[in-house]
Amino acid sequence: MTRKIVILTEIIAPYRIPVFNALAGRAGVDLQVIFLAETDKALRQWRIYTDEIRFSYQVLPSWRLRAGKHSLLVNRGLWPALDAARPQTILCGGYNYPASWESLWWARRRSARFVLWTESTERDMRAGRAGVEWLKRHFVSSCNAFVVPGKSSFAYIRTLGVSEQAIFTAPNAVDNTFFAIRAEKNRAHATELREKLKLPSRFILFVGRLVREKGVFDLLEAYAKLESSLRSQLGLVFAGDGVSREDLAQQAQRINPGVVCFPGFAQREDLASLYALAEVLVLPTHTDTWGLVVNEAMACGLPIIVSNVAGCSADLVGEGWNGCVVPPRDSEKLSVAIDSVVRDGELRQRMSARSLARIRDYSPEACADGLAAAAIGAVTRAL
């Protein structure tokens, strides 16, 4: 029996396209994706790979209102779009948009099943946000089932009074095959690539927005704490852009010896080159619901150093196994972790093999399996 599913999600994120393609290809699934906006140019410089889309979709008209770090995405046309699609199940990505609530109301009026797809973790709970937490609990109490990417989100949604039977795991995923193949090809031309991209012969890699909350200044400080003999042969590369780039670059000039590079924002094709040449990926973030750059780096066979507040740390990184897990805002422990990985080539090889082995379970197909299971499971769960 075919089940009509609508996924409601914010933007056309490149890493979601393979997942939705896999779900649309499932027997018994009639999928339509409704995007609230094409992209968010203020935060995302992603190329939009619409030519790779193999599922039915539409982008709603939208307006994004900003006030400091906060934004509100407002849409029109959602109710008619849902009436036209007539889904039996809505998979809603998040609860922080007006469209999230509108789709919930539509589901209640039309007797459709409603599944919340959330990456929130306990770290999202902030002091002084009691009103937000109340609204969140009210939203959650109206859902039939829930999709989470991993252990941290699973634990958090349980604190909101949700039973284990109502929670389905759809592991966060990127196109592992794309990154693995690209990395292998790029390593075959490592010397040429380093010269072309003006990269150090050995380097630590950070990928993401260059903003304080990503821990970029902690990483720079940790690099400065490495022994000078090690820094003289090991660079640090910040791949990305953001409001802290200029401050980072100025502080980096004071580190001697050492080489700190800022190649700018990289699309996925160029990212594969950086992953292929790096010795370790470091994500010392202060807050992150997951951290998909870790998936990308592991698909390229990199050891990982990540802060324990990143949602992915509980699922993807084993301490001393394929990397290190450190507390946020602790440059001393971060420096020790970096030193332990970059000094031992044999250890890096073992960690590399383990990263490749673990990330196989975090594929677009596995994520699609979790989404499909939630859509089916929602049918059997009454509110």
Indicate where each model-derived feature is located.
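Conserved acidic donor-binding segment of nucleotide-sugar-dependent glycosyltransferases
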Residues: G318-G320, C324-S331, S340-E346
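Aromatic "clamp/platform" in nucleotide-sugar-dependent glycosyltransferases that forms part
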Residues: H286
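Short hydrophobic beta-strand element within catalytic cores of glycosyltransferases
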Residues: P303-S307, V317
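Nucleotide-activated donor-binding/catalytic signature segment of Leloir-type glycosyltransferases, i.e.
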Residues: E246-A266
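A short, histidine- and acid-enriched strand-loop-helix "catalytic/donor-clamping" loop
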Residues: P98, A112-A130, S142-A145
